[in-house]
Curated annotation (Swiss-Prot):
Gene3D superfamilies: EF-hand. Ca(2+) 1 binds at D33, N35, D37, K39, E44. Residues 1-9 form a propeptide. InterPro entries: Centrin_CML-like (IPR050145), EF-hand-dom_pair (IPR011992), EF_Hand_1_Ca_BS (IPR018247), EF_hand_dom (IPR002048). Disulfide bonds: none annotated. One of its GO terms (biological process) is bioluminescence. Belongs to the aequorin family. Keywords: Calcium, Luminescence, Metal-binding, Photoprotein, Repeat. Ca(2+) 2 binds at D126, D128, S130, S132, E137. Ca(2+) 3 binds at D162, D164, S166, K168, E173. It comes from Clytia gregaria (Gregarious jellyfish). This is Clytin. Pfam families: EF-hand_5, EF-hand_7. Ca(2+)-dependent bioluminescence photoprotein. Displays an emission peak at 470 nm (blue light). Trace amounts of calcium ion trigger the intramolecular oxidation of the chromophore, coelenterazine into coelenteramide and CO(2) with the concomitant emission of light.
Length: 198
């Protein structure tokens, strides 16, 4: 694994038994369960990521492939695969495995799966190649992905992630806050998606 040279790489501890952590992942499971049958598949997630989000963001075929590879690796670590239906208990157990795996890499300043995904996303919406994204670029992604459908929620996310107060977001800041939000319940990452995700 490559060194990320992250200035935010510190040991973070998960809190898997906290009902808030479980509810956060239940919300995401339901968000991903497009047809509401209580099961999700990697097919559904990749279709949303590639056919919907990447296409609407104007990703090139190379960017879409890189993004799809990152999404596949991330969700396969949770235990998902093509054609395999996963119910919530297995999904949340898979998140625990993923969190432990990624947090260990993060504490060693090595590239995690969430960082790979973040880099793939940044490559798509960092249109000017500056290595950072603006609030407007983040708002566009939030609307297209559905994760920050209101400007207010997108602005809250942006503020939470702008750790160096530069008015721009880089992938290192986004990775740190997403680790804190999805993996550990770090209070510094609470409200990452505004009022949309608990």
């Amino acid at each position: 694994m490559a060194d990320t040279a992250s200035k935010y790489a510190v040991k973070l501890r998960p809190n898997f038994d906290n009902p808030k952590w479980v509810n956060r992942h239940k919300f995401m499971f339901n968000f991903l369960d497009i047809n509401g049958d209580g099961k999700i598949t990697l097919d559904e997630i990749v279709s949303k990521a590639s056919d919907d989000i990447c296409a609407k963001l104007g990703a090139t075929p190379e960017q879409t492939k890189r993004h799809q590879d990152a999404v596949e690796a991330f969700f396969k670590k949770i235990g998902m695969d093509y054609g395999k239906e996963v119910e919530f208990p297995a999904f949340v157990d898979g998140w625990k495995e993923l969190a432990n795996y990624d947090l260990k890499l993060w504490s060693q300043n090595k590239k995690s799966l969430i960082r790979d995904w973040g880099e793939a996303v940044f490559d798509i919406f960092d249109k000017d190649g500056s290595g950072s994204i603006s609030l407007d670029e983040w708002k566009a992604y939030g609307r297209i992905s559905g994760i920050c459908s209101s400007d207010e929620d997108a602005e809250k996310t942006f503020k939470h992630c702008d750790l160096d107060n530069s008015g721009k977001l880089d992938v290192d800041e986004m990775t740190r806050q997403h680790l804190g939000f999805w993996y550990t319940l770090d209070p510094n990452a609470d409200g990452l998606y505004g009022n949309f995700v608990p």
